[in-house]
Amino acid sequence: MPKSLKIAHIVRRYTPAEWGGTETVVRHTVAEQRALGHDPRIFCTAALQPPDARPSDDIQFFPYFYPYFPMPTADRLKLDKKGGSPYSPALFKAVRDFRPDVIHIHAGGRLACAAVKLAGRLDVPSVMSLHGGAADVPASEMAEMLRPLKGKFPYGSVVDRLLGMRFDPIARVDAVVCISHTEEDRLKERYPGRSIHYLPNGVALPEMRADAGKADSLRNRPRPLRVLCVSRIDYQKNQLALVELLARRPDCSLTLVGPVTAQWYADKIEARVQELGTGDRFKLVPGLPPGSAELEAAFAAADVFVLPSVHEPFGIVALEAMARGIPLIAANIGGLPDFVHDGENGMLFEPADADALARAYDRLAALPAEGLARLTSAARATAESYSWPEIVSRLMRIYSECRNGA
């Protein structure tokens, strides 16, 4: 591999106001690649960007559109937030002018197909990261993401055929990066002979401030146990399960922090809280920038962190809670059981079982101080093995294998 590589990262959306796992991964990957002496750039649509958004050395934003008619603003915004498959010709002209050595795709659909075709024309390898999963997206979640397209004329299907973009990008890229062993296994079965790699997300350890006193405060609390969930307010994240827990366990309070990507679901949460009469122990904060003082304060105040998702390809925020020494309860789904081991460094529960979350909560609350200390110590040790420098070093080896085989 040359000493310095020009790396084009293709991203569908990138905005602190609507942050998520993909943005976190790309941000840290680019920072580590720059530290290694490479030249990474982020090429992104202008989805969710304010009109005065300005490019930087790391990122450029480009016009885009969804090829459906009609496309009212409300539906475009829903697609921007989740599930959209846009065209962005200007984005790929800029990538072509950049002349990258590697194209790293962090999107699916039309952006992925266009990136694969451009990599072929430039004779450079393409790597595709499946941040949102591909083999294990629930049918109900897929249907909800596609709801804004209902009743619209898909003129893009004609354009796709004319441009030769009706193909499966996973079958054409030089390497696929999965963030869970479950998806890795399924894709290797579905795409035999393809270069498919398990590469987990990382955690920015220097930014974490582990609180060794969490176990003591949990055992000797003169107040309700403070439960925190930081994730998008979205049906995928299953925060309604936490609202039900709040009603069943009067010894806890609940704070939800995250950008609202499904307004109807946020409304449903608020309505259920009012119906249950638990508003005095509930708070919803619709999004805090990563690294902000307010977000750090929310983590610092938490006694327990819960991630109850029904679909979770990885779950970076669970690692962040573990690194901070916050006792963790997580759904036994997707990439979470790859690093959360029940009873050892956290508690797992089956999200399809209505009573399982309450049982996991009770198991955690019943642990003696020594047991909680062991749990959080093991959690911090787990998080330390997911440092970004190590993860990006492994990614660069994947690039090297692709370039050597190109």
Regions found by a protein language model. Name each.
Residues 24, 225, 229-248, 267:
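A conserved mid-protein helix/loop that constitutes part of the nucleotide-sugar donor-binding site
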Residues 121, 134, 152-175:
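Membrane-proximal helix-turn-helix segments that form the acceptor-binding/catalytic region
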Residues 182, 202:
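Carbohydrate-associated surface elements
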Residues 267-289:
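Nucleotide-activated donor-binding/catalytic signature segment of Leloir-type glycosyltransferases, i.e.
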Residues 287, 297-302:
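Short alpha-helical donor nucleotide-sugar binding micro-motif in glycosyltransferases
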Residues 310:
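Aromatic "clamp/platform" in nucleotide-sugar-dependent glycosyltransferases that forms part
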Residues 327-330, 340:
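Short hydrophobic beta-strand element within catalytic cores of glycosyltransferases
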Residues 342-343, 347-354, 363-369:
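Conserved acidic donor-binding segment of nucleotide-sugar-dependent glycosyltransferases
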